């Protein structure tokens, strides 16, 4: 009986080949879903950013209270004839803003503010429609990457909540003798818009690379830079809230000087609340401070200084990374912060002229996204190559 010769290296040379690692579910993408979902998210990102800008213009033109009803579906159709315009104008005439601020307004003037508010709401409907069509389309076609439907569903849920908060905010300006919405409700509304925009941006960044690429990149995660961007996100979010409080009571127009505030560092009466005794233990006093122009404007300036100072310090650390893309992200962020300082000062000195004020708000959106971009690259660095010249 012949004896079969065996190689002493048989286990290594002739054994079963190890399976080749496969990409994750999002890599397979079920027919390119990853790319499609990313494009869909980018469309939503542009729409939400436009929504924030239009919302700012609606506020700056005092148009937000021109529509006194909340009709999510039927409100999509504007007045189409003279009778409908007259009926709509009559509803506005019952509002405190008309009686106390716009008495005698002409139909043409009313139509001008009406179209701003209608456009703002209509854009919200478009965002909801784009989200619903995209989400249901990917879901029904079974092209939704495994594990992604909850986070994409969350965008729609938050969008619906945002619509309700928008009406809750508007309703506050239709009561009593108010001629504007409550600044605290405006702050909630704007803050949620930034949260939604940030969620969309983060998911789109994740979809820019495969799961395998993200897994490899995560091995070189730069924890210190990631922690620094976390601090920046917290401070930037606080600054957004404070900016909304300033805008809600037009606090920027009362102190058109810089770096001082009408000749002093601490504005006069910044701790004064009408009708409430100054008492650190009194919640009414604390809430009243949010309606004090000097107090909220001072905090907004200080938070801005803190954000820029931290951003520039963290930029120094970001420049030390070996990853070129990460260095570039911190460079862009530092430049945006400096530009935002200039816009902020310009907004103050112009007493919040709408052109400068809206540019300042757009700057806040840009900074928010750039922080998220730097954070993403700190968590998932893009590995450079000497051969490709990307190191």
UniProtKB/Swiss-Prot annotation:
It catalyses: Fe(II)-heme o + 2 A + H2O = Fe(II)-heme a + 2 AH2. GO terms for cellular component: plasma membrane. The chain crosses the membrane at residues 37-57, 121-141, 152-172, 186-206, 229-249, 298-318, 332-352, 354-374. It is found in: Cell membrane. Heme binds at residues 300, 360. The keyword Membrane applies. Pathway: Porphyrin-containing compound metabolism; heme A biosynthesis; heme A from heme O: step 1/1. Keywords: Cell membrane, Heme biosynthesis, Iron, Membrane, Metal-binding, Oxidoreductase, Plasmid, Transmembrane, Transmembrane helix. Catalyzes the conversion of heme O to heme A by two successive hydroxylations of the methyl group at C8. The first hydroxylation forms heme I, the second hydroxylation results in an unstable dihydroxymethyl group, which spontaneously dehydrates, resulting in the formyl group of heme A. Interacts with CtaB. This is Heme A synthase. The gene is ctaA.
